[in-house]
Amino acid sequence: MNTQLNNTNKKSLLTLSALTLAMALPVTAATMLTKDNGAAVGDNQNSITAGERGSVLLEDVQLIQKLQRFARERIPERVVHARGTGAHGVFVASKELDDLTIAAPFSEAGKETEVFVRFSSVIHSKGSPESLRDPRGFATKFYTDEGNWDLVGNNLPVFFIRDAIKFPDMVHSLKPSPVDNIQDPNRFFDFFSYEPGSTHMLTWVYSDYGTPASLRKMDGWGVHAYKMINKSGDVKYVKFHWVSQQGIDNLDAKQVAKVQSQDFQHLTRDLYEEIGKGNFPKWDLYIKTLDPSQLDDFDYNPLDATKMWLDVKETKVGTMTLNRMPTNFFQSTEQVAMAPANIIPGIEPSEDRLLQGRVFSYADTQMYRLGANHQQLPINRAKVDVVNYNQDGAMNYGNTTSNVNYQPSHENVSENPIARRSQTQLKGYVQQAAIKKQQNFAQAGVLYRGFSKQERTNLINNLAGDLGKVQNSDVKHKMLSHFYKADTEYGTRLTKAVNGDLKMVKQLASKL
């Protein structure tokens, strides 16, 4: 009797299980786990073994594939600007700039252009605390009707150096030592003691501007001069400036210590949370312009990346709103490839020596990180058709069907004369020499005197914290002489803060 009941129960249970499975299949089929080739996975919890105590078998494709893919999840880290966060948005032109440029985003008032912005730290590694003192990258990709335009700048208006040939050395000095992997002020101040042009940027970085409280509450600067070209071929030099509608908010040293002890990713978290709440940050874009004939009107070189155009009026040309965060960090923020080489008709690089190097370097490093076909990735893909004969290479998923992969040919694929490079009149000789009107210290002094009393004190304390660690007396006093040359109060206070010899500082400064 018991046996009969058990068999009956078993049959009922099997019938019920089969019915349940049949009912469930249409619901779960769409979420079935698969291998990379699309084939179903039968067991993702246990490896295939030779019996209970035997070795794992090499034929376990699911195990091997998971381990292989896991070992290849990381692409090369950016040499600079490694840690970052990004957001989607829109730029709206506030006026047409036909008199200045044929660039698509400025073709008419009210014109909307989709953008992606990547904020970043410059020197520190991908997993570093966001509260560390560092310039912040502020790079914007415009998806325009004429192709992608990348405006790759920072949250500070100038840079440490003016010639790209010094860029690798500068970064090496700022990065951790190759011996012990520790970032060392002895190293980077040694380098900067030979680069008096860095005084202006160091004054910015060691002020509270070097530790922003929020990505939403900092400005962005193009840093370099660019060129704008109108339909007549007329050229104007231009500088770009993003002005935060949220205002500016920085952290002092005490606030930095408090924030870092609580949240080492406060900048990223703030951006995600605020945009998630619908508090969309906005920046107004301003430009300054100079006629080529005005370049000699200043006591400095306007194409020097260590300088600001202090006496040139700004004009508002549009507003950017960030309104959507990426749904996948890697696919968007990590794979986005910003490069000053990505320009469109109506905008060109100037003769700024640092920018000239960046035009090559940034595009090249993106090819190294992401491959030759990185511009086919969704985050980098232009909204317009890409028509050229660049072909093949790793991860190329284009579809070349024509027998003609060259130009010119009988096929009707031609150039657009409006996109030709503007003409620049040259004079002089091919040379290898520094620029003439360097003025290494004046603008650093203007900046220092423009700070409030508390901002000056914070700057001195921040600088003394690192400069006071420098063991080489010559290096320390050369640096002190640079700051003294910028402003006597600046240099005197800093010398006292690091127990320097003011008499020696004055002697060194007199020779600058």
Across the structure, where does each feature detected by a protein language model lie?
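Active-site-adjacent core segments of small-molecule enzymes
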Residues: 30-512
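Gram-negative bacterial Sec-dependent N-terminal signal peptides
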Residues: 1-30
